[in-house]
Amino acid sequence: TETRPKLLREAAVGNIAHDPNGHGYQPYVGIPELRKGFAAWYQRWYGVDLNPNTEIQPLIGSKEGILHVTLAFVNPGEQVLVPNPGYPTYTSLSKILGAEVINYDLKEEDGWMPDFETLENMDLGRVKLMWTNYPNMPTGANATPELYERLVDFARRKNLVIVNDNPYSFILNEKPISILSVPGAKECCIEFNSMSKSHNMPGWRIGMLASNPEFVQWILKVKSNIDSGMFRAMQLAAATALEAEADWYDGNNRNYRNRRHLAGEIMKALGCTYDEKQVGMFLWGK
């Protein structure tokens, strides 16, 4: 079954064949068409207004953003809060760059949400970043508006930056939400997104981050010393793919539901239990 937007393939072929500027260096900030595409996508699906010129930074996949953000915000010896369980790269890159990792536990009895009472009682004087990831890898827990409101309030009061990794919000999820929908969140939050997950195109390496203009400029200062931009044809094709209609996402999720059902049957055959309300691309059981 075709699991990528048809218009992505058509746009890619056309752009590679006919764009005479496609073989040169591209802007560090990404081409305007892609930035505008991400801005329109965020407005349409998350209800979040982003300035495409100052509040969006395309990435060569959102994974590289973990490196860029850590370099921009954390000095060696400073601390970062990392969820446990969680994406291993938050921990490994922090350690490589000399930061101290402080785990905060996500527990089943709390719905795999942060325990704010425990966090409030921690010494956070050296903490610069707090990594969050919803829909969560690997537990499948989904975010709520209330969770995002609490995280923004926590970041403001504790003078730290929340980095919300949000690549799975279109997978088996009725209503994608963004932490940036919380009023004032841009002041203290950065959000990642990834077309690897939302549009099934991991080999294209197209992601993005969004935040306030000052944070974006700090990150761009790091990024511009690491790479020299993405292939123009891929950026143009990605901008076109961001125009996919709801029926494409619905069809994609039908495929995921079929796969989730098969995975669930395997789990049951093994005597495992799991929460059927999980969203995203993981099935977490025991």
Model-derived features: positions:
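A short helix->loop->beta-strand "cap" motif at the edges of active sites that frequently abuts
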Residues: 78, 99, 157-161, 185-187
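Structural signature of PLP-dependent enzymes
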Residues: 219-226, 241-265
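Active-site phosphate-binding strand-loop segment of PLP-dependent enzymes
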Residues: 102, 106-177
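Conserved glycine-rich beta-strand-loop-beta hairpin in the small C-terminal domain of fold type I
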Residues: 239, 256-267, 274-286
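Active-site PLP attachment segment
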Residues: 182-218, 230
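N-terminal small-domain helix-loop-helix segment of the aminotransferase-like
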Residues: 1-61, 68, 242-244
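Conserved PLP-anchoring active-site segment centered on the Schiff-base-forming lysine
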Residues: 72-94
